[in-house]
């Protein structure tokens, strides 16, 4: 497992890291659909989540556009999609307990499931855990992010 300042990045998934878009997203493919969520780094930066407002199932999303809005005591913002696609499922459990994103970002705290418009293009923007750790290192240092 890759790690940055105590923030884990499981190697069984891919990552979309784009600081300009505030995108620190993981993605895991199953049967042509990607489950996406916040990395532990993003969850730590946001703070304890108090609200989760997903877009509607069936909605088309563009790369870097919101699949959901999340809110903590210190931050409100979008969860960007790593690629163009369609939202096929949202995590209903987060509506009642958004802090699952903080407690279990790579499990029960997933954000949405997105079917990419172009699967090959989707995979081309994602990186493995080691590359994600490399990209996240300067951000974690600059912002003083710690996990665990």
Curated annotation (Swiss-Prot):
UniProt remark on cofactor binding: Binds 1 lipoyl cofactor covalently.
Coiled coil: none
Pfam families per the UniProt record, alphabetical: GCV_H
Source domain of life: Bacteria
Cofactor: (R)-lipoate
Similarity comment text for this entry: Belongs to the GcvH family.
Subunit structure and binding partners: The glycine cleavage system is composed of four proteins: P, T, L and H.
Protein name in the entry: Glycine cleavage system H protein 5
UniProt organism field: Aquifex aeolicus (strain VF5)
